[in-house]
Amino acid sequence: MANLHWEKLMSDIIEVKDLVEVYSDGTKAVDNISFNVKEGEFFGFLGPNGAGKSTTIKILTTLLRKTSGQVTVAGHDTDTDASDIRKIIGVQSQETTVDGDLTGRENLTLQGHFQQMETSKIKKRVNELLKLVELQSAADKRARNYSGGMKKRLDLATALIHEPRLLFLDEPTTGLDPQSRTAIWTYLQKLNKEEGTTIFLTTQYLEEADKLCQRLSIIDFGKIVASGSPAELKRQVGADSIQVALENCEKDKPQAKALLKSMTEVTEVIETSEECLTVYAKNGGVLIADIVRALDSSDIRLKSVTFSSPSLDDVFMRHTGRRIRTEELVKAPSRMFGSGRR
């Protein structure tokens, strides 16, 4: 049994090679990407809105034909073996698909019939899922009366009704409050660890990818810019980051950059569109006072200085020159120094 389990973890359930997707207007939504997902893995696809995440997941779930490249799911080609793939996958899209006129139990039962499950098995599975997503008390209430978080949980349950080998989640927690988001995380971790379900998650939330995913790929403008475990990717950054915002960024940036690069503790200085400059340094926390004094002595007006330990946002910026910024972005709090606002 142990050997079989190991073989399962070592085998690829998703294989993508040189995938390209070009829309009819000429837009290249996915630009020659390659990656693999192992069976039993919790894999993340991290990137800002418009990066190509949803397009990729549509191809993987057979909803969109690729322009070129090779894509297989459980050994089946996404273009020629769509029906075989759909039997073994579950999909939760960004928008909830529950029927508000039906109760939670009725929504799940209907989905079971769509999957051509036996009636006796449907009843048992519905009860299991209602317990999993903690909707037993609301099971016989119409879904239109559910909160946003409850609808998301019901939507997740419908994707699991037929016990799929592989679950695709396209930004499943977008728009949820922190409590509901944390609850979804708990269910997903349980599915992956206790039931061995392979999970492919697209997300724009840094904390979500960091907490849940064993491995991930970061995508931007249709290209994969980095891949690895969250810990590996953060180790590649290797240093603390200090975001330096100047009152007059365009005027003072060249002088400030040269000044900061001359400091012996600094390993790298990158120009960014948000904070003006990002400084990488070992033990960056103790360097902040020196940065403030150095800029002040050169009559460079400082707006703010923000310090943080290596994060996935730093990984993204290292590869793209900017940060992942969206209204819904969730990041660990960082410490702010200075009187200015970000």
Where are these regions (language model features)?
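A short, local hydrophobic-aromatic micro-motif
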Residues: I14-K17, D31, T67, T267, ...
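Residues at or immediately flanking beta-strands
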Residues: Q70, R142, S241-Q243, R301-T306
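C-terminal coupling/interaction segments
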Residues: A2-E7, N283-R342
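A generic structural signal for secondary-structure junctions
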Residues: G90, Q116, D155, G238, ...
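ABC transporter nucleotide-binding domain
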Residues: T186-K282
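ABC transporter nucleotide-binding domains
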Residues: S11-I14, E21-A226
